[in-house]
Regions:
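P-loop NTPase switch module centered on the Walker A-proximal segment
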Residues: 1-43, 47-56, 60-62, 111, ...
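P-loop NTPase catalytic nucleotide-binding module
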Residues: 57-182
Length: 182
């Protein structure tokens, strides 16, 4: 957010585009307002996008804005990702918000990267697809670290990924429940 009004409010009030390249692909991020006071601005950005990333506070979780953004995405047949933000804020809880997302939006919500939290501090992030842990430096560069002991929680998270994939396709569903997807 760079507009003086946005800086004052600490939220986006206008749609903005931030282009960048990833390999040979140009990606345009379209930042839309999250507050429903600016729903018209958000709708413009959603219509122009191929997919949506909906930011959800790690402290307050799913709210009316989250539900309306998701409905807008589904009504327009947009692929949707959720990003749990504000994990550095006191009383934030990624896992509580993840469960809330699943109960609100269904079993297709699955974790891809999850935080490893110790003493209310994020120590690293675990990519559940490649089963590796990473930290990030001040420049945003990833550094692989040893996988922390996640106990039984890791099994539940990887099962959630498999279940979500199985929910999207009949053949994957059959493969998962035959035991071949574990």
């Amino acid at each position: 957010d760079f507009d003086p009004e946005e800086i004052k409010r600490k939220v986006s009030v206008c749609t903005a585009v931030a282009p960048f390249a990833w390999g040979s692909t140009k990606i345009n991020l379209i930042d839309t307002p999250g507050l429903f006071d600016f729903a018209g601005e958000a709708a413009q950005g959603v219509r122009a996008a191929e997919s949506l990333l909906i930011a959800v506070s790690g402290k307050s979780g799913v709210d009316v804005g989250t539900e309306k953004a998701y409905k807008m995405a589904k009504d327009l047949s947009k692929a949707t990702l959720f990003f749990v933000s504000k994990l550095d804020v006191e009383h934030s809880d990624f896992y509580k918000v993840f469960e809330e997302l699943k109960s609100t939006f269904g079993p297709s919500v699955c974790p891809i990267v999850v935080p490893y939290v110790e003493d209310q501090q994020v120590k690293c992030y675990i990519n559940l697809i490649d089963m590796k842990a990473y930290t990030y430096d001040d420049k945003g560069e990833a550094h692989e670290v040893d996988m922390p002991d996640f106990g039984h929680r890791l099994d539940g998270l990887t099962a959630a990924v498999s279940e979500a994939v199985a929910e999207t396709d009949e053949s994957l569903f059959e493969k998962y429940f035959s035991g071949a997807g574990n």
